[in-house]
């Protein structure tokens, strides 16, 4: 299988640039992408089997991988949830699929967001990982407007080997992540 554009960019351009910027002594110290998780909480749709199926097909279409149904660990009466009920779906992307999805995300999907001025640079977790919330699935070119029954959002978490937010931000910026200026 041919390597993706971003993986080649990482190996040929980003590694030397970050090595020089942070004075790494070894190429293995340079932060890299580990995985991308795409998650959707079902909320009220947990009781509706048709809504669950629609979410499963949408996430599978967006990521190119079959999602896993996450289930409630314990019952919560306030949320009308019993143990074992479906509460969300998620996909973990690694390797070539991860790079292909990330490429589509930053070059095609994010610019399609209405009134897009860049993404917030404040959504790092302190350890170099970034989480992005998407309000509607229509920003992905794989989803057709006529095929959806309801607008639903999803969360995208980008997990890196960076030690802190500064390294993580530098890595994602080099990949072409459109951060908003502060």
From Swiss-Prot:
Bridged cysteine pairs (disulfide): none
Cellular component terms per the entry's GO annotation: ribonucleoprotein complex; ribosome
UniProt keyword annotation of Isomerase present: no
Gene Ontology process terms (BP): translation
GO terms assigned for molecular function: rRNA binding; structural constituent of ribosome; tRNA binding
Assembly: Part of the 50S ribosomal subunit; part of the 5S rRNA/L5/L18/L25 subcomplex. Contacts the 5S rRNA and the P site tRNA. Forms a bridge to the 30S subunit in the 70S ribosome.
Listed PANTHER family: 60S RIBOSOMAL PROTEIN L11-RELATED
Chain's role: This is one of the proteins that bind and probably mediate the attachment of the 5S RNA into the large ribosomal subunit, where it forms part of the central protuberance. In the 70S ribosome it contacts protein S13 of the 30S subunit (bridge B1b), connecting the 2 subunits; this bridge is implicated in subunit movement. Contacts the P site tRNA; the 5S rRNA and some of its associated proteins might help stabilize positioning of ribosome-bound tRNAs.
Stated name of the protein: Large ribosomal subunit protein uL5
Originating organism: Nostoc sp. (strain PCC 7120 / SAG 25.82 / UTEX 2576)
